[in-house]
Amino acid sequence: MKGNRRQPAVASQPTSPASPTPSKGTSKYANRDGSKIISVPKPSLSVETPQPSPTVSASMPPPTAGKGQPPSTAPTAPSGSNASGGEAAPTVNRKKAKRRAKLAAKAAAEAGLSGDNLSNGVAAHSASSSLPKQPSDAGHSDNEGEALSRPSQTNGHTSTGASKSKKGRKSKNEDGRFMDSAGSATGSNHHAEMRRPPSPIPHASPGRASGISKEKIWNTSSQEERQRIKEFWLGLGEEERKSLVKVEKDAVLKKMKEQQKQTCSCTVCGRKRTAIEEELEGLYDAYYEELESFANQPNPNGDVPPMLGPTGHFGSTAYTSQIMPSKYPPRQPSRGRIVEHCGDDEDDDGEDEYSEEELDDDEDYSDDEEPEEMHRQRPTEYQTDFFNFGNSLTVQGTRFHESLNSLPPYAKSYMEQVLKYVFRRDVDHSLGGILTVADDLLKNDGKKFIEMMEQLAERRMQREEDAKEQFARNYHINGNNYPAHAHPPPPEDDEEYEDEEEEEEYDSQDEEYDEEEVQTNPVHCACHCPCRGGDYGDAGMSASADDGSYQDHGQESHAKQHRHLQDSMTEEQRMEEGRRMFQIFAARMFEQRVLTAYREKVAKERQEKLLEELAQEDRETEKRKAKKQKEAQKRRDKALQKKQAQAEEKARKDAEKAAEEAERLAEEQRRQEEQRQKNEERKKKKEAQRKAEEEERQRKEAERLRRAQEQKERQAEQDRKAREAKEKEKKAKEEAKQREKAARELKEREARERKEKADKERLEKEAKIKAEKEAREAQRKAERASQKATTLANVPVPTGPARRQSQAPNPAPALPQSQQASVASPQLPTAVPALPKLPTPQKPRRTSQQEPFTSGFAAQQVHGQGAGQYPAPPKAATPVHTSPGPGGLLSKGSSSQGQSLHSQATSPLGTSLPTSTSLPTPFGMPHPPPNQHYPPGIGPLNAPPGLGGPRLFNDYPEQMYQQSPFGFRQATQQHPQLPPGLGIPMGPGRGLGHGPPPPPGLSAQQSDFPNMPASIFGSIPKEPSPLSSHSRQASANFDSPIAATPIARPTPIGRPGSVVQGRRGSSDSPGRPGQPGQDNLEEISAPHLGSSALLDDLDEPLMDDFMQDTRSARRSIPGPPQSSRFPPPAVGSFPMSNSPFGPSLWSQPGPSLVNQGFGGSFGQPAPPPGFNSLSDALSVNSPWTFASRPPPRHNLPQMRKVLIQACLDLASTKTPLLDEKAEDPSRRYLPITAVKKCVDTKFASGSTFTVDDLMSMTNTEGNANNGGGSFDTQEFDGELCVRWVPDDIGDSRTVGRSVGEIGSPIVGSRG
């Protein structure tokens, strides 16, 4: 029976390399370093292929065949028979065996000395796949640094004793690590005794699909990954496994057809395509049948299916004999068949190591799990996988070299060519990480596989041709069933020769591998499968003709090689090799399918795991949230409870506090009641005390009121008495005023009567005197003609007597003619002067003989002379050249003055009035002291310009001019320094007494300064010149209205003297000098007629304001009140535009004070000779300066005229106009600010006009006096504008006329 067939145990036999008995059926080969020993089985004559005993197979792990190792076909002796019994063993070349045994012994000795592990030298089918890794063996399989080769057994032949000893020693060095080997029962028993039994793994239930622990789903360890892949395959169902297996056929066929589309359509290619498709169909069908048969084969032990045979490969004879009868008869292995030791334990360890290191690349997985996955078996140590060959090549470092060196020369050359073709580089440079051949074939779109199929089809076609050829040569060939071992073994000499040739070839291949690179042909490489270990014929086909792989047969032709192949391997064997090659590729592709499915499964599980973890996280988050909410609710409940407890505690405390508060309130009420009672008692006491105090206060108040009433009564009485006294006094004053008024009226009436009487008498007397004068003049005319001219040219006659009594009568030289001519008025032409004649003494006349209208001034002079003054000696009278007064304004004074002068004509020439004779001061000023000196031209009696005599001021009342309108500061008593040019100190309390010199033609005043040289006004003699007894009016231009004015009445219509000159003291009326007489009172009280009607309404208030301003200026002087002695200027004597008092009241033209040396107060003209500058003299610290200056006042009509003129000027210039639409530029609106600036420039002295003043003037109705026309105002862009519109009827030419009031005489006008 099959189960009783056991191989003879030969383990106890002594082993010797030279022993002929054990080595009869094998040939041993060793590489140079001795690490690998190759046992080549010799051809066996046995027809039946022995199968291993099921018992042995079940109890002992079968040895794995080396990758690419063909299934063992060596027959074993039947049960109970010895190896030597039965059929004769094939002959062995003893010489080769002996030589190889020596080499093996030598190599073993060297390996023992160097510590290297050697193989036992037993010929066996080596397996390249690693054992299934168990948890107990994981540490050994994964941690071993270098895998060692394991002994193999082939065809039931046991190894020699030396080999066994080496194996035992090697196993000790490896800590009990062993490799499966197929051999005899002895070898198997030996391995069973030495190997530790593997711990079984429980069979995975089909319900556990994933078989993967969720806790280790992310683990990428190689060992756990293998385990998970196994569990995944075992967990798959029947249909899932079939789908994974059968999908390969369609994919390969489809890829093959796509590849064949690019070939030509010739008959050969068509046959090739057909052969390829048939080959694939047949191979896949057989492959699926084998898989199905293997899966469905009953398990002898009841738990797992039968294990693989010694070869461990699909399609092997051992395997197929177990599951199905082979359709090919058993064949004798080729005499060139060898057993590779490259797939031993050493390669397995390297593969495990590589699988652990390269698992992340997902390129290779351990080959130990695929058989278990495919067959759903529990992984055991004796199971192998389908991919040992590919993974056996995946080694690193020198171990790969060792693996290659362990191959025979033709196999090693083929592997090098394949690797070079795959990686396009040398083998030595690809040791860092080499993929398997199957992986490369799969990753290169199956090109390698397709080429292999093409080679198989070509070989099939070649086999058919060979069969025909052999049939033609009378060879017995069965096309379908090849006879087993039909080829007889070659002669022993040929075998020996071939062995020697193989040895030489092997040596030469080793040298070539070590020394030079081997060139390969990719097409031939794909044709020869490395899994079959290669034979001589295949090795010859796999190498190119010129690659130097064979030293002796490199130049043989292809036909010779083919014949050699036919001799060395039967067709059955070649078909078996192709079939086995296909199975390897199909297994590799199936492995990739399983791996892809596993990866998809893992990815899905990982995704589910991620989703589950996310869901778990969500659940945990929800749990945490719920927990937090629960905790928060607990906290809220706890806080609520706490609040409730606090509320209860608070309520309790509030209750206690309320109780305490009630007690306190009760106590407080009790205390308040007691306090109230005490307060009431105290209040009653206070009330009684208050009543007593109130009574006392009322009593005192009544007493106080009584006293106050009495005081009021007394005060009222006193007030009544005071009022009565005041009333009495007022009545007395009123009565006195009435009486005084009545007396004044009486006096005025009497004075008027006397004045009328005197006037009448004066007229009569004047007529008489005129007649007498004309008579006398006719008599003396011839006598005084020559004298009058010289006298009149050299000696000016003074118009009045001397004003100083203390000065000596020293005559002063007369002014030269040139000086008199320089000051003469150009508008007063003089007639041809009469020649002066010798004066004739005349008898002085009495005062009673004088005219009744002689002024008191002259009378005082006469009376003064008669009072004890010595009269001057009589001299010849010189006619006085007198010019008429201006405009008849002073006709009355000038006539009386002329009469006064004529009254003194009886006195001789050269005599003067006595020094004691004093003239009344103007405006009622007191007489100056005798020793008072004045600057030249500023004497107390000098009249203002235009008024020609001292009698000018005698007609004004004294009380009107008690204070000077000019606020000059008085000089000190110590006579301070006079201004430059004056040189004479001035007495204290004196102002500027002398005025400017009179106009040309009027007599000049004498100087009061005895030592004063001739002044700027001409020669001023100390004593007055003797008055001429005869005077006549000088000839004048009758065209001039002023020259035609008579000396006396009738005078032209003009302003009354009372209005023009103010109050004047009457010299005609009796009384004291300077006091107003009756005539003056009547004149003042009488209404003004005539030219007074021509006065403007604003003139009189201006006069009052003028006097008021002068008083205020005087009051503004610091210090005690002092009276100024400076006489006021003549009315209209200077224009008010240069005056601090505003415009002139009557606009009388005449020289202003600035022309008389008043300095910077009235302008700055050049000072006359002898005066440095009155502006220096009238400085702030000078006694001649004004203490204050009143603000200037302007005449409103004149101001309106100036405003009109300003509007016309602006309209005529390029001033920007706001009303551009007006046709007439003079009627355009002008900004009020520009008009104001123009008005300010016209008043050089500085105006105080404001915009409101100008606007008020624009509202004044125009007339002939103020310029006429009317003003229009309008606002443009927020700015007020004004324009002047002239009247249609009125004449606007009056605007441009010179200043002056209506009725004022103007020099040069025709009146």
Curated annotation (Swiss-Prot):
Biased composition, Polar residues: where in the chain? 46-58, 116-133, 960-975, 1026-1038
- Kindly list the places in or outside the cell where this protein is found, as annotated in its UniProt entry: Cytoplasm
Under the heading Pfam families, the entry gives: NST1
- Comp. bias regions, Pro residues: 923-933
Q: Gly residues composition bias: which ranges?
A: 984-994
Keywords from UniProt, A to Z, are:
Coiled coil, Cytoplasm, Stress response
* First-listed, main subcellular location of the protein, grouped into a coarse class: cytoplasm
* Composition bias type Low complexity, residue spans: 8-27, 68-86, 805-829, 891-922, 934-945, 1041-1052
Basic and acidic residues bias spans: 213-226, 613-682, 689-786
* Compositional bias ranges of the Acidic residues kind: 343-372, 491-518
Where is it found, in Gene Ontology cellular component terms? cytoplasm
Q: Which InterPro entries match?
A: Fungal_stress_NST1, NST1
Annotated region Disordered: the residues are 1-226, 308-379, 478-521, 542-576, 613-1083
Q: Which CDD domains match?
A: ATP-synt_Fo_b
Q: Which sequence ranges are marked TM in the entry?
A: none
UniProt feature coiled coil, ranges: 450-521, 599-795
Compositional bias, Basic residues, is annotated for 93-103
The UniProt function text for this chain reads:
May act as a negative regulator of salt tolerance.
Family (UniProt):
Belongs to the NST1 family.
Q: What is this protein called?
A: Stress response protein NST1
Q: Which organism's genome codes for this protein? A: Pyricularia oryzae (strain 70-15 / ATCC MYA-4617 / FGSC 8958)
- Name of the gene: NST1
